[in-house]
């Protein structure tokens, strides 16, 4: 368990035939074109107008201009050997006001062009309906994810997407990381629309309506589209693995509780009909309740689980940790070091991201055991580096730490499959350097470097070239790559 995993050897042959390898992005982070194509404002468009909210004062107004460069990007993706692409559809490009009445045909045309070009290049589309870019009008008029009305509006939006794109898109994700929207968007306020730490109950309400909205979208698909289109609809949850800090019972239970407040918060209602008991015990009336009708409605409304995973932590029980409310109420302390003082893994650029490949194997096995071995896709996995303006192009393209990250984590996925977890695919985050939310452009997750100072030109990094060799089965070169 103490091994970093970066010395792991992994080849395409370690995975089953048909296993999907792809890359992932999201609309707000890459598209740009804020005021083009009939698009309405989303909450991030408005949130970033206050430059103090973003580390470098930036926004996604232009981002990396994927809206105008999608053909260049898809051609590069295909040339590297990727055969699947997880992208997100911008809700206000389809319904500028979010109300679900007047479809913006220019928005539909853009995504039709994107999807058709992907398929032409041999790339399978995996479409996310919601990756945090809520139509601003819905936030203003109904309160966004704090209102039960959002469930109906989301279902209308989902139906429009299924109707317009579902003849070609067979893999749908309703919502990306509802935990982040709930906690950072409506609770702490680091993300749009910007809540505040004192309004603790808001994040649990925002989570509640995201679960119901997910179920409503799946219901629409199953009733109106599945028989003809034959696709599948899943939910993407983010989770860091929680490794007990010691063999003490209280630490073992604390680690389980930490997972309840991540995976369990969203998947328990769908698979079992209600929130984890550990959440109910600690939150009381702050945690909304599902009616019996709701419980019946949401049960088993899922075809696959998408897991976004980047890192792991040691978890110890702590009666009153000095942390934000979301962690205080869990009564857990997230620890980065072993008892010996050695860190759990090498740190990437972000202070929260440690390279811990073995954590992913444990997480996949945990999810498989808890939820009856569902179909799982690793829908995001990657690491960031600082944006270093003083570095040469050759230096920034030589991302050997990221190559090691991917080797270790992919080996962990292969091990989980051998353990019996039904993992069907893996998507690297991210294809392109992009707008990294509250961090702006100060962090780079891409396997393709985007030169922000020179026309947003694209340059594949060493990690992209490693992936290309891996996908094309050049195992001998792969094994020599890090020597």
From Swiss-Prot:
Pfam families in the record: Glyco_hydro_1
Binding site for a beta-D-glucoside: 29, 131, 176-177, 310, 380, 429, 436-437, 445
Source organism, top-level taxon: Eukaryota
Keywords assigned by UniProt, alphabetized: Glycoprotein, Glycosidase, Hydrolase
PROSITE patterns linked: GLYCOSYL_HYDROL_F1_2
Glycosylation sites: 398
Active site, per annotation: 177 (proton donor), 380 (nucleophile)
Molecular function as annotated in GO: beta-D-fucosidase activity; beta-galactosidase activity; beta-glucosidase activity
Family: Belongs to the glycosyl hydrolase 1 family.
Full protein name: Beta-glucosidase 4
Organism: Oryza sativa subsp. japonica (Rice)
Gene: BGLU4
């Amino acid at each position: 368990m103490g091994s970093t995993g970066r010395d792991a050897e992994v080849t395409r042959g370690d995975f089953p035939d048909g296993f999907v390898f792809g890359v992932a992005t999201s609309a707000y982070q890459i598209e740009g074109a804020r005021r083009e194509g009939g698009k309405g404002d989303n909450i991030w468009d408005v949130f970033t107008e206050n430059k103090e909210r973003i580390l470098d004062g930036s926004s996604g107004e232009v981002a990396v201009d994927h809206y105008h460069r999608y053909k260049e990007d898809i051609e590069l993706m295909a040339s590297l050997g990727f055969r699947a692409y997880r992208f997100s559809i911008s809700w206000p490009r389809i319904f500028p006001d979010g109300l679900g009445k007047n479809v913006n045909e220019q928005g539909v045309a853009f995504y039709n062009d994107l999807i058709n070009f992907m398929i032409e290049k041999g790339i399978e589309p995996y479409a996310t309906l919601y990756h945090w870019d809520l139509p601003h009008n819905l936030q203003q008029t109904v309160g966004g994810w704090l209102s039960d009305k959002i469930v109906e509006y989301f279902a209308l939006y989902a139906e429009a997407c299924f109707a317009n794109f579902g003849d070609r898109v067979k893999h749908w994700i309703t919502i990306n990381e509802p935990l982040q929207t709930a906690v950072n968007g409506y609770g702490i306020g680091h993300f749009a629309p910007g809540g505040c730490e004192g309004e603790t109950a808001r994040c649990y309400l925002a989570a509640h309506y995201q679960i119901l909205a997910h179920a409503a979208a799946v219901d629409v698909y199953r009733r109106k589209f599945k028989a003809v289109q034959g696709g599948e609809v899943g939910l993407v949850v983010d989770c860091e693995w929680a490794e007990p800090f010691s063999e003490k019972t209280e630490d073992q239970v604390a680690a389980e509780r930490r997972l309840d407040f991540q995976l369990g918060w969203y998947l328990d209602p769908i698979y079992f009909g209600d929130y984890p008991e550990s959440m109910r015990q600690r939150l009381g009336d702050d945690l909304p309740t599902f009616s019996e009708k709701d419980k019946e409605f949401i049960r088993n409304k899922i075809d696959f689980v998408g897991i976004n995973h980047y890192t792991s932590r040691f978890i110890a029980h702590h009666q009153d940790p000095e942390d934000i409310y979301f962690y205080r109420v869990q009564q857990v302390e997230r620890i980065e070091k072993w008892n010996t003082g050695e860190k759990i893994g090498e740190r990437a650029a972000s202070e929260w991201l440690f390279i811990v490949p073995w954590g992913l194997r444990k997480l996949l096995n945990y999810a498989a055991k808890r939820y009856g071995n569902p179909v799982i896709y690793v829908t995001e996995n990657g690491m960031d580096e600082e944006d270093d303006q003083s570095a040469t192009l050759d230096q920034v393209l030589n991302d050997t730490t990221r190559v090691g990250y991917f080797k270790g984590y992919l080996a962990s996925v292969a091990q989980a499959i051998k353990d019996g977890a039904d993992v069907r695919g893996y998507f690297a985050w991210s294809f392109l350097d992009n707008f990294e939310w509250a961090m702006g452009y100060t962090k780079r997750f891409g396997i393709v470097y985007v030169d922000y100072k020179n026309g947003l030109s694209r340059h594949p990094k060493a990690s992209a070239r490693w992936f290309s060799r891996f996908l094309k089965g050049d195992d001998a070169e792969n094994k020599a790559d890090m020597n």
